Amino acid sequence: VEFVLETIEELLGSNENRMLFIWDSLALTPAVSDIEGDFNPLSSMAVKARILAKGMSKLTVPIANSQSTFLVLNQLKTNITRSPSETLTTPYMTPGGKAMIYAYSLRIWLTGRKAKASFVTDDKGFRIGSEVKVKLEKSRFGTQGRQCNFKILWGEEVGVQDEESWLDAIKSSHHLSNSGAWFTLDYGDGTSDKFQSSGW
């Protein structure tokens, strides 16, 4: 963790160009004390969170001033807590402490579905992708809390199929009306299109 933060600081100080930093992944990056210490988890408890808190307080302004982007990938972990109410309301958490959450300008929560109905398969029945649910947990650019679903593909057709999520995004628009299985999209100039969600 220390090496990642130090490298970003060094690159920001030696380069005047805008940069994109991608950290994959925060959860699997150990601190120095994790590597040099023993197997007792209590010996390095909250060390990574404290390092990240210090690191983000140092890097947030330089990243913003250079108009760079810092993209952090993380994993969901089961929230082990003694509070039954918190277990029900927040079953998952992300490693790294709250400093990262406060520093994020945009926080996107992706969860995959385990049901076979969410699998994307090819003509031979092999799985080539999966449908994920996406929620905008935090945003300094727009309305947070919005949700959509889209499909992530891997292999030769790697990428995101997000056409269906466009329909979810415009369902609340006054230009789109719904009657049964049919949607009508009004362009505002007297013309419109009628379609079903399967033909979107």
Regions found by a protein language model. Name each.
Residues D122, S177, Y187:
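Acidic surface patches and DE-rich sequence motifs
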Residues V1-K54:
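Conserved inter-motif catalytic segment of the P-loop NTP-binding fold
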Residues E10, S14, L110-G112, K135, ...:
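Catalytic phosphate/metal-binding cores of nucleic-acid and nucleotide-processing enzymes, i.e., regions
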Residues R18, Q67, N178-G180:
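Short secondary-structure junction motifs
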Residues A181-W200:
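Terminal-proximal interaction/regulatory segments of ATP-powered molecular machines
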Residues M45-S173:
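Phosphate-binding/switch region of NTP-binding enzymes
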Residues A169-S179, F183:
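PDZ/PDZ-like groove recognition
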